[in-house]
From Swiss-Prot:
The chain crosses the membrane at residues 14-34. F(1)F(0) ATP synthase produces ATP from ADP in the presence of a proton or sodium gradient. F-type ATPases consist of two structural domains, F(1) containing the extramembraneous catalytic core and F(0) containing the membrane proton channel, linked together by a central stalk and a peripheral stalk. During catalysis, ATP synthesis in the catalytic domain of F(1) is coupled via a rotary mechanism of the central stalk subunits to proton translocation. Component of the F(0) channel, it forms part of the peripheral stalk, linking F(1) to F(0). It comes from the Bacteria. It is found in: Cell inner membrane. Belongs to the ATPase B chain family. It is a single-pass membrane protein. This is ATP synthase subunit b. GO terms for cellular component: plasma membrane; proton-transporting ATP synthase complex. The lineage of its organism: Bacteria, Pseudomonadati, Thermodesulfobacteriota, Desulfuromonadia, Geobacterales. InterPro entries: ATP_synth_b/b'su_bac/chlpt (IPR002146). Disulfide bonds: none annotated. Keywords: ATP synthesis, Cell inner membrane, Cell membrane, CF(0), Hydrogen ion transport, Ion transport, Membrane, Transmembrane, Transmembrane helix, Transport. Pfam families: ATP-synt_B. PANTHER family: ATP SYNTHASE SUBUNIT B, CHLOROPLASTIC (PTHR34264:SF3).
């Protein structure tokens, strides 16, 4: 739409000087023809040539003006096109800058959000590590207490067992020593008497 308007303005600026030029040439031709008709009655060749030369000069000057006007019109059109292109490029650059700033703000927000999430994750990991550390320490203490209790119970049982064994051994040794002492102290008559008493008691039981 903008290019069509520019072309229309350019065509209008060219047509106006061309129309003026055509009108001037037409008037010059008519004047020259009229003078030529009058010259048939009273011929003045020198004056006609001089007038013709001036008309040629006028025509050349007019043609130069027309060419200058056309070039100026083309220059204005080219300048307008260049201005439009520059304005378009500036608009596109501004739009690109706005889009880049929008993207930058968007990515900055995402980066900030990601940093916050990373901080939260790091804090959660540290908290979980502290809880795990405390749990491991508590389990280690509980295990150590159980081991100490088991060791104490085992030691106590071993002590009781050793005491029982020592008592049994002491009783056995005491019996052996008593038997030996009796053997040494009891005479043959006492042995026979003890045997007879034992047999009598057995018979009485039956």
């Amino acid at each position: 739409m903008a290019n069509a308007c520019k072309k229309k303005r350019l065509l209008k600026s060219v047509m106006m000087p061309a129309a003026v030029c055509a009108a001037v040439i037409g008037l010059s031709a008519l004047g020259f023809a009229a003078e030529g008709g009058e010259g048939a009655h009273h011929v003045d060749t020198g004056k006609q040539m001089k007038d013709f030369m001036w008309r040629v000069i006028d025509f050349a000057a007019l043609l130069g003006v027309i060419i200058w006007a056309l070039k100026k019109a083309n220059a204005k059109g080219a300048l307008a096109d260049r201005t439009a292109n520059i304005e378009k490029a500036l608009r596109e650059a501004e739009e690109a800058r706005a889009a880049a700033e929008k993207k930058f703000a968007e990515y900055s927000g995402k980066l900030e959000k990601a940093n916050l999430e990373i901080d939260d994750i790091y804090a959660a990991i540290r908290k979980e590590a502290e809880l795990e550390k405390e749990r491991i320490i508590a389990e280690a203490k509980l295990t150590a207490d159980k081991i100490r209790e088991q060791a104490a119970a085992t030691a106590s049982q071993e002590v009781l067992k050793a005491k029982a064994e020592l008592r049994g051994e002491a009783a056995r040794l005491a019996v052996q020593m008593a038997e030996q002492s009796l053997r040494e102290n009891i005479k043959k008559d006492d042995q026979d008497r003890l045997v007879n008493d034992y047999l009598t008691k057995v018979e009485n039981l039956h």
